[in-house]
Amino acid sequence: FKRDARNAGLPRNIRDAEQVKRLTAALRGASAGHPLFVAVDQEGGKVARFQPGDGFPAYPSAAELGRGTPDATRRTALGMGRMLRELGVNLNFAPVLDVNVYPASPAIGRLGRSFSADPQDVAAHGAAFADGLNDAGIVAVFKHFPGHGSARADSHKGVTDISATWSERELSPYRSALGRPGQR
């Protein structure tokens, strides 16, 4: 629904919650009864398509959540998930399971998109975030496999090659998260 006019040439079209509810209802109505994923990229922090300026609640970044407990992360994601569900969204491109290997990373570290530099902390908070979304009826999508936390460039602005910076420890959160019961 919302695009940056500099990137896609489309105006921003989210005005408020009621308008988003009408848009998602219209999408479902046009689906001829077929199941439909209505997805958003709502991580919290700086990556939020539903923004406070449009009347939506602000949510902390992964870096902020990572300084707390996994249970607090789950509760935050549950609240976010309930808000998304009310809007008619059922899939969220979150949480980020990137390990903050390179804090100066323009796409991860600088934006506070990683829970931690410790793979076990990332796994614990990522699982808690997914559980909170799932408890609200939202499908969680883990990203950015195989790991974007060591990237020296922003993949939103071009090809990012991590072959020289990537390490095996960046897989750990994915192994933990995907190895849990009920995860695919």
Residue ranges with predicted function:
Residues 145, 152, 161-162, 168-184:
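Flexible, glycine-rich surface segments
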Residues 84, 133, 177:
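Hydrophobic pocket-lining residues that define ligand/cofactor binding sites across diverse proteins
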Residues 32-36, 89-90, 134-139, 179-184:
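Short, well-ordered coil/turn segments that N-cap beta-strands
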Residues 23-27, 80, 125, 129, ...:
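A general structural detector for well-ordered alpha-helical segments in enzyme core domains, enriched
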Residues 94-97, 142, 184:
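Non-cysteine beta-strand/loop elements that form the S-adenosyl-L-methionine
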Residues 41, 84, 129, 143, ...:
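Conserved, mostly hydrophobic/aromatic
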Residues 119-151:
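Loop-centered beta-sheet repeat module
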Residues 1-121, 149-161:
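Enzymes and membrane/adaptor proteins characterized by extended Gly/Ser/Thr/Asp/Glu-rich
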